[in-house]
Amino acid sequence: MRLVFAGTPEPALPSLQRLIASPRHEVVAVLTRPDAAAGRRGRPTPSPVARLALDHDIPVLRPPKPNSEEFVAELRELAPDCCAVVAYGALLSERLLAVPPHGWINLHFSLLPAWRGAAPVQAAIAAGDAVTGATTFLIEPALDSGPVYGVVTETIRANDTAGELLTRLAESGAHLLESTLDGIADGRLQAVPQPADGVTVAPKITVDEARVRWDLPAHVVDRRIRAVTPNPGAWTVIGDARVKLGPVAPESAEPLAPGAIRVLKNAVHVGTATEPVRLGTVQPPGKKPMNAADWARGARLDASVSAQ
């Protein structure tokens, strides 16, 4: 099939790579978000998907308004049989959705109807889910509600961060997307409506929401920190400094009041609503992440300081 691939960040790359290599499909263009400012100088930088497409001499479309009449007309001229979507980053109008005969097929990183929205991987970890996965479905105007073509499951490991889990889902999801498109091309796949029960939503997590709440149980603190690692990144205020935190580990140790700090020779504990947690890495402002015990020694941290 003639395909237009819509995607923007790194998790979309395995899918685009597989479709470029597929003997059954031709990626005639890539649709991605406009270049964004990056680096200290804020220079406009192409998205990871744009860079991969350019490396393969595939035309890159970066419309600031993808639902405009001009872009709808441009897409019609490309005459795609189908559009494949992986983390494109914009809602699509009904006029745009109607252009390809086989519609727009989205790869979503959850087992729909669970965790519809922008942050399904983070939501699954924060909720303590044991299993998640990826789903291919036909895009409809309502958010992540379209009929399903296929699913693949993935176990959530005890220490998974959102970044680690997303990396695995991006790979397994790429296989699923390719097989879904193969099945559509063959006429052997029929989409199945999502069940009405079991719908949960996963809106984008803000920086404010990534602040650690030490008044929660240790296992919840652990999950919530892993859910926002690496982005947007967990943080807390210790003394007068706002620091980013890597994953933590609940400790079977003497309890501490929520936010209270215990500095040991080779560890730093912070109190929660239950047992304390041991800090892993700490990143002070303007510095690289470092071992929490090394940071505490350098900062001359003591029990008079707490995490807020």
Swiss-Prot record:
It comes from the Bacteria. (6S)-5,6,7,8-tetrahydrofolate binds at residues 110-113. It comes from Mycobacterium sp. (strain KMS). NCBIfam families: fmt. It is an enzyme of class 2 (transferase). This is Methionyl-tRNA formyltransferase. Transmembrane segments: none annotated. Belongs to the Fmt family. GO terms for molecular function: methionyl-tRNA formyltransferase activity. Attaches a formyl group to the free amino group of methionyl-tRNA(fMet). The formyl group appears to play a dual role in the initiator identity of N-formylmethionyl-tRNA by promoting its recognition by IF2 and preventing the misappropriation of this tRNA by the elongation apparatus. Its EC number is 2.1.2.9. The lineage of its organism: Bacteria, Bacillati, Actinomycetota, Actinomycetes, Mycobacteriales. Pfam families: Formyl_trans_C (PF02911), Formyl_trans_N (PF00551). The gene is fmt. The keyword Transferase applies. InterPro entries: Fmt, Formyl_trans_C, Formyl_transf_N, Formyl_transf_N_sf, Formyl_transferase-like_C_sf, Met-tRNA-FMT_C, Met-tRNA-FMT_N. GO terms for cellular component: cytosol. It catalyses: L-methionyl-tRNA(fMet) + (6R)-10-formyltetrahydrofolate = N-formyl-L-methionyl-tRNA(fMet) + (6S)-5,6,7,8-tetrahydrofolate + H(+). CDD domains: FMT_core_Met-tRNA-FMT_N (cd08646), Met_tRNA_FMT_C (cd08704). Keywords: Protein biosynthesis, Transferase.
